[in-house]
Amino acid sequence: MSIQSLLDYISVIPDIRQQGKVKHKLSDILFLTVCAVIAGADEWQEIEDFGHERLEWLKKYGDFDNGIPVDDTIARVVSNIDSLAFEKIFIEWMQECHEITDGEIIAIDGKTIRGSFDKGKRKGAIHMVSAFSNENGVVLGQVKTEAKSNEITAIPELLNLLDLKKNLITIDAMGCQKDIASKIKDKKADYLLAVKGNQGKLHHAFEEKFPVNVFSNYKGDSFSTQEISHGRKETRLHIVSNVTPEFCDFEFEWKGLKKLCVALSFRQKKEDKSAEGVSIRYYISSKDMDAKEFAHAIRAHWLIEHSLHWVLDVKMNEDASRIRRGNAAEIISGIKKMALNLLRDCKDIKGGVKRKRKKVALNTCYIEEVLASCSELGFRTDKMKNLTQI
């Protein structure tokens, strides 16, 4: 994707300011912010500083007729951007950059931006629910919710915005809801949902059907793995069963339900082989999968913690940021995910995310390489027609 294509997307976001008083174009401010975040900026002052240092380069792609806005102007403008419009642009942009292939595993999970709280205004930290493609390590979209407990309402909103056809959607127990399962099936996709106590009857049925002693000599479809790390050996057993008579009532309640899945994890110390713990996790799925596919799917879902949440915290300083004005925390979170997608997709620059950000800060040639790194699908006029209706 060319830099001009990115600018085309940015330019569609509505500017709510009084145009007669505007000194700095919204597209210029957003382009500056995206480039600065890619280059390692985490605060408003750092975004302004980047702009002053790279003004001549920025003028190649934007107007910047009145130079670089001060940090407070950047903060005020970004904080007033319509968050829903931004979310739609983000998703449309990612669909241009990343063509989802049939059968991809898409993990949906939430993360609290810890620094976004504001005690003075009695405002708690916001919670972002993201869709993450495990195959390519990119974020496909995000939706904000005011608390983790509101994920149940945020997940359907995110599902509505995404093209999920023929993919497997994995969600933890918070998203194990009948309406969410139905929504996924309506989107022509399949689900793999973790089952815990919030679905009491279903969870109890699993406990009755799959007690611990059944695993010692299980005759059905199973797949096991072993992993030795930090002096511990962990054995994981995965089993998949068709829906049995005990679960026939649940077939009517959960749209498309086909498989009952169980993951047993047994940990022991390597030296004395003493047991450290056994955990059992239950899942339901609409996909006609076997035990090996199930093992791969739940492993892929766990990767969102390290491949997305951990990277945002450690490599991109998301939790440390005190940006919290208006919609700013949500918008900057989305821009950081855009930056992360671009940095990961750029193979011309060697190194991890942190090293790439430092290289981008040192040389504008690297910025151009990163911005052009998304798959060259181009900006289609049919997309522009839809986006102008935001």
Swiss-Prot record:
Top-rank taxon: Bacteria
Lineage of the organism: Bacteria, Pseudomonadati, Pseudomonadota, Gammaproteobacteria, Enterobacterales
Gene encoding the protein: yncI
GO molecular function annotation: DNA binding; transposase activity
GO BP terms, alphabetized: DNA transposition
Keywords annotated in UniProt: DNA recombination, DNA-binding, Transposable element, Transposition
NCBIfam families reported in the protein's UniProt record: transpos_ISAs1
Source organism of this protein record: Escherichia coli O157:H7
Name under which the protein is recorded: Putative transposase YncI
Sequence similarity: Belongs to the transposase 11 family.
